[in-house]
């Protein structure tokens, strides 16, 4: 093993990464290559994220990836020098067991301290920790490292459900209805990319999984990504009617103002939208529907009574105090919708708060 001084020197080189005026770029790069600080035909840059976690940057991973993720990729690529380097820098060599594909690499990991195999719960734990990093680079890497990985074939599906629900919420059951673990995982990474509008990752999955267009639209509606929804709609890749789209926008999570408004402008039934919001106990969505002109209070109240939602019954019983918000426009442009609804608070929720102070705390 290299000395502590050698490890420190490599870290300093990777952290500072400043070209010297007194030596040529070619010679500087030659030094980095000799030190093993080279990946994807370019220098390796070492940095730290806001949580003080070590990150690796290269031209392919411009946003940076966590050190343990970088180790997993190096193991998958059978890049022995980088496996040793990342382990020297503190990567957990057991993460490498996720992506081993040759006996030589397995032997190297053993020599570096890896255990013989991962338990099922450890595989899930590693996947959970890797998901902390919501970038395009990481979602693409998650797909490459986990989706067709035999270690995921026998995981505890109860634990898998918990991880999926953490990110997908009420889309979890729909996602788990798929037949294979590889399809579940592919849609999972794709869904996270849409949820956080990770454009490079969205494009990556779109190019490779054209048959998952409906899933992409479902995620855009459910997670309030009006930009991606509009992109799919204008290219005629949405094969749902307006009311089906609105149902998804209202049901998965609260405060989905942008996608609800988009569907409303397309002509979706706003009273039906309020009913779906009632059934899913999405209070902000209910008030937003009222702002947009929903007025089927009697029917909505009946639904709330059936479900035992007493607070919603109280809200809809005060229909006499509500009125549509006249500040909206009819422009179906994502940038306009995003600007209009930035920091938005439903007008009728203000009215309700004044009438019934303390009943509901948003």
From Swiss-Prot:
Keywords: ANK repeat. InterPro entries: ASFV_MGF360. Coiled coil: none annotated. One of its GO terms (biological process) is taxis. ANK repeats lie at residues 66-98. Belongs to the asfivirus MGF 360 family. Plays a role in virus cell tropism, and may be required for efficient virus replication in macrophages. This is Protein MGF 360-19R. It comes from African swine fever virus (isolate Tick/South Africa/Pretoriuskop Pr4/1996) (ASFV).
């Amino acid at each position: 093993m290299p000395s502590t001084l050698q490890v420190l020197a490599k870290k300093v080189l990777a952290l500072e990464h400043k070209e010297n005026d007194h030596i040529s770029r070619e010679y500087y790069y030659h030094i980095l290559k000799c030190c093993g600080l080279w990946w994807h035909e370019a220098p390796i840059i070492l940095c730290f994220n806001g949580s003080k976690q070590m990150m690796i940057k290269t031209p392919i991973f411009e946003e940076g990836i966590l050190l343990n993720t970088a180790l997993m990729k190096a193991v998958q690529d059978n890049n022995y020098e980088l496996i040793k380097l990342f382990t020297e820098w503190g990567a957990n060599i057991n993460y490498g067991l996720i992506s081993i594909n040759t006996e030589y690499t397995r032997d190297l990991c053993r020599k570096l301290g890896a255990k013989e195999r991962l338990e099922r719960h450890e595989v899930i734990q590693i996947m959970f920790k890797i998901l902390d990093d919501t970038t395009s680079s990481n979602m693409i890497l998650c797909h490459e490292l986990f989706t067709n990985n035999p270690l995921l074939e026998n995981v505890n599906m109860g634990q898998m459900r918990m991880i999926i629900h953490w990110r997908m919420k009420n889309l979890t059951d729909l996602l788990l209805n798929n037949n294979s673990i590889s399809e579940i995982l592919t849609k999972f990474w794709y869904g996270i990319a849409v949820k956080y509008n990770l454009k490079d990752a969205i494009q990556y999955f779109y190019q490779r999984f054209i048959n998952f267009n409906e899933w992409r639209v479902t995620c855009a509606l459910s997670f309030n990504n009006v930009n991606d929804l509009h992109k799919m709609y204008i290219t005629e890749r949405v094969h749902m009617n307006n009311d089906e789209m609105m149902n998804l926008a209202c049901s998965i999570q609260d405060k989905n103002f942008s996608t609800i408004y988009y569907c409303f402008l397309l002509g979706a039934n706003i009273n039906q939208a309020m009913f779906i919001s009632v059934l899913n106990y999405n209070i902000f969505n209910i008030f937003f529907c009222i702002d947009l002109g929903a007025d089927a209070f009697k029917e909505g109240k009946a639904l709330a009574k059936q479900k035992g939602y007493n607070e919603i019954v109280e809200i809809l019983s005060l229909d006499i105090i509500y009125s549509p918000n006249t500040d909206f426009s009819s422009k179906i442009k994502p940038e306009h919708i995003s600007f209009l609804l930035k920091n938005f608070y439903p007008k009728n929720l203000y009215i309700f708060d004044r009438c019934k102070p303390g009943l509901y705390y948003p």
